């Protein structure tokens, strides 16, 4: 009972929202990319031509070597020659260009997210009115109201949809949004959550400078893309089609790694600092992170069983994938999905790991494997990014006989 100022009494009502019964499932996945394709072997010439930097011969030679070793064959980007010619401040390293970038990003990031969301909703096969929550994630531009609001308008979602906007989390955020969606779905019976990650390199594209060699790493790796998922518990029989279950999720910060990955919004856009120590930091800590996850999930951690799990790893770059593979003694096929997405799209920041998840389930069906997780039952999803933050999820696959994609 509560006593108010007028000495009247009121009764607290019991909590009415029920928890879900079963585990949270991925019910659909959609993706999208801009139309402009850049082949990695040709990108150094394009990059140094468009930024008028061919006089920096040694820097160009270094960049060419970086692109050759990137594990990337091609990338998709919103930017093209026409955009960069029309807005020369973007292609300069030092010019003030934040306003120009922002004006484009606040329009284009939600638009690309909408294409991915439309694809996910089409696969899901249920009316948009059944969406109860929207989570939107981007590190590309900031505005109020945010990209979540813009996407709600573009999709024609109900104005009462519960929205969560996740800004500036970087490469690990594809896992973060699934951790948030898991908590929402578990605690709100019948909820259906639309999760969208959309990123454009327009926020960080700029010409080379000898003062910031790390800038070249980002220019060699990053690509544009959007991914969308429908997430919910207790799939409706014969109406919804689960491809994975999310059973455990946690966020961790690697010790003594504060400056390994940082991004700062400046007048010339998002300036990234990517340390050479990132792969070593991940390699040195991956055993501890996985031990905690697997012990809590399975009451035991057997390092020899790592190859009995499927691996959905953020395709951040070949050195990161090499570090995980080597430290865990993984067979090369365990990182195939991540390397394939890196090869075809580059590092798309938050959507990248979700592209890996989509690729894995479709390949598993196409190759007639027994489960959506490459024929294996349990798997690990890993995201790495600023902090140095590591997101870890434990997933369970479903039998491919029970899963269909169109």
UniProtKB/Swiss-Prot annotation:
- What InterPro entries does the entry give? Chalcone/stilbene_synt_C (IPR012328), Chalcone/stilbene_synt_N (IPR001099), Chalcone/stilbene_synthase_AS (IPR018088), Polyketide_synthase_type-III (IPR011141), Thiolase-like (IPR016039)
- List, from the UniProt record, the residues annotated as the active site of this protein: 171
Supply the CDD domains for this chain.
CHS_like
- EC annotation? 2.3.1.156
Q: Which GO terms describe its molecular function?
A: phloroisovalerophenone synthase activity
Extract the SUPFAM superfamilies matched here.
Thiolase-like
| Annotated keywords | Acyltransferase, Transferase
Keyword check for Acyltransferase, yes or no.
yes
Q: What does this protein do?
A: Produces 3-methyl-1-(2,4,6-trihydroxyphenyl)butan-1-one (phloroisovalerophenone).
Q: What's the protein called, per UniProt?
A: Phloroisovalerophenone synthase
Q: Which organism is it from?
A: Psilotum nudum (Whisk fern)
The uppermost taxa in this organism's lineage are: Eukaryota, Viridiplantae, Streptophyta, Embryophyta, Tracheophyta
Task: Point out the gene that encodes the protein.
Answer: VPS
């Amino acid at each position: 009972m509560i006593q108010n100022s007028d000495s009247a009494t009121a009764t607290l009502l019991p909590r009415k929202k029920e928890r879900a019964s079963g585990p949270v499932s991925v019910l659909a996945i959609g993706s999208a990319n801009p139309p402009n394709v850049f082949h990695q072997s040709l990108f150094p010439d394009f990059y140094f031509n468009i930024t008028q930097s061919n006089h920096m011969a040694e820097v160009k030679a270094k960049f060419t070597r970086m692109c050759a070793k990137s594990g990337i064959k091609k990338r998709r980007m919103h930017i093209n020659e026409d955009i960069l010619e029309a807005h020369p401040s973007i292609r300069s390293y030092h010019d003030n260009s934040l306003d120009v970038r922002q004006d484009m990003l606040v329009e284009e990031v939600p638009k690309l997210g909408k294409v991915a969301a439309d694809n996910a909703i089409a696969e899901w096969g249920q009316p948009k009115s059944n969406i109860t929550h929207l989570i939107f994630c981007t590190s590309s531009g900031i505005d109020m109201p945010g990209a979540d609001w813009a996407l709600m308008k573009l999709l024609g979602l109900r104005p009462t949809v519960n929205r969560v906007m996740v800004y500036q989390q970087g490469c690990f955020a594809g896992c973060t949004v699934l951790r948030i969606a898991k908590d929402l779905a578990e605690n709100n019976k019948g909820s259906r959550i639309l999760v969208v990650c959309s990123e454009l390199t327009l926020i960080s594209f700029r010409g080379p400078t000898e003062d910031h060699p790390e800038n070249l790493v980002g220019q060699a790796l990053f690509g544009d893309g959007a991914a969308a998922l429908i997430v919910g518990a207790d799939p409706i029989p014969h109406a919804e089609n689960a491809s994975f279950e999310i059973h455990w999720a946690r966020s961790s910060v690697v010790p003594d790694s504060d400056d390994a990955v940082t991004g700062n919004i400046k007048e010339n856009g998002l300036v990234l600092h990517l340390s050479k120590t990132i792969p070593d930091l991940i390699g040195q800590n991956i055993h501890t992170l996985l031990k905690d996850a697997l012990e809590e999930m399975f009451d035991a951690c057997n390092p020899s069983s790592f190859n009995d799990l499927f691996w959905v790893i953020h395709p951040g770059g070949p050195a990161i994938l090499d570090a995980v593979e080597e430290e865990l003694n993984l067979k090369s096929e365990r990182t195939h999905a991540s390397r394939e997405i890196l090869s075809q799209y580059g590092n798309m920041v938050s959507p990248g790991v979700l592209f890996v998840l989509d690729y894995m389930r479709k390949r598993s069906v196409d190759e007639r494997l027994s489960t959506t997780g490459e024929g294996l039952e349990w798997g690990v999803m890993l995201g790495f990014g600023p902090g140095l933050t590591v997101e870890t999820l434990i997933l369970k696959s479903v039998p491919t006989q029970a899963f269909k994609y169109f």
